[in-house]
Design a protein with these regions (language model features):
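Rossmann-like dinucleotide/flavin-binding elements
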Residues: 1-28
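FAD/FMN-dependent oxidoreductases across multiple families
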Residues: 7-13, 35-113
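Conserved anion/nucleotide-ligand pocket segment
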Residues: 27-29, 36-37
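Short acidic (Asp/Glu) and glycine-rich catalytic loops that position anionic groups and cofactors
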Residues: 27, 88-92, 131-136
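Internal, well-ordered alpha-helical segments in soluble enzyme and binding-protein domains
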Residues: 3, 15-18, 44, 48, ...
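C-terminal helical "tail/cap" subdomain of flavin- and related membrane-associated enzymes
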Residues: 112-230
Length: 230
């Protein structure tokens, strides 16, 4: 299997492939990109053909099945409680990890939290708390992808080269230890990520101050976030 293969033209966006073989001559090939503009079907098929030929030496192939979609990649807050008896879940409930688009493990953890809330409180409105550390890291990576997309591929290459896969998977699943997080952060290009981290912190502090001021004027506190959507 191939995980996040960046050997494809980035063209001003973050683009990579996944390859999951089922047999010697059959595989699932997924093309992922973080962008504001959706590709046409022709552009997607051309990128797939170019990748298979230049990276894997496959000039002729047949597509057996295909699917596509677009996910919201943003760190903006999602309203979860939509009424007295309605709780947003899944994509609508902001269960997609902002910086990667991964959702399966987050949905499972959220489902467990909903069950615990029902058993303990008689309602589902005590969901799993969002780890502030991961949300800040998501915001940093989103800012890097938006402002320095060409630097993402070498940064991820360094991260994969300097960390065991088990640590990376724990990090992506938001199950990492403090040492895991520090090790991964240390493996990334310091000038870019430290600078972006400081910019992100300043932006969040500034947005929070404006939100508190609006809250005083309107009698409520408004959440604020910056991000990029796909």
């Amino acid at each position: 299997a191939t995980f996040m293969d960046f050997r494809t033209p980035q063209d001003g966006a973050v683009r990579f492939f996944y390859v999951l073989p089922f047999a010697d001559n059959q595989a699932l090939v997924e093309y992922t990109l973080f962008t504001d503009a959706r590709l046409t079907r022709q552009e997607t098929e051309q990128a797939l053909a170019t990748y298979l030929q230049t990276v894997h030496g496959v000039a002729e192939f047949r597509i057996l099945e295909e699917e596509g979609g677009c996910l919201p990649i943003t760190d903006a807050p999602f309203a979860r409680r939509l009424g007295k008896r309605v709780l947003a879940i899944g994509v609508r409930g902001g269960r997609i990890k902002p910086s990667t688009g991964y959702a399966f493990s987050r949905v499972q953890a959220d489902s467990d939290a909903i069950v615990r809330s029902l058993l303990a409180c008689g309602h589902p409105f005590e969901p799993l708390a969002e780890p502030a550390c991961y949300r800040w890291l998501d915001a940093v990576l989103l800012r890097v992808m938006r402002t320095h997309s060409a630097a993402v591929a070498p940064a991820f290459a360094a991260m994969f080269d300097r960390n065991p896969m088990s640590r990376i998977l724990r990090f992506l699943d938001e199950q990492a230890t403090a040492l895991d997080i520090l090790s991964i952060m240390a493996s990334l290009p310091a000038p870019l990520f430290v600078g972006t981290a400081l910019q992100t912190a300043a932006a969040q502090i500034g947005a929070g101050g404006k939100a508190r001021q609006r809250g005083k004027q309107r009698g409520s506190r408004q959440p604020a976030a910056t991000g990029m959507s796909q």
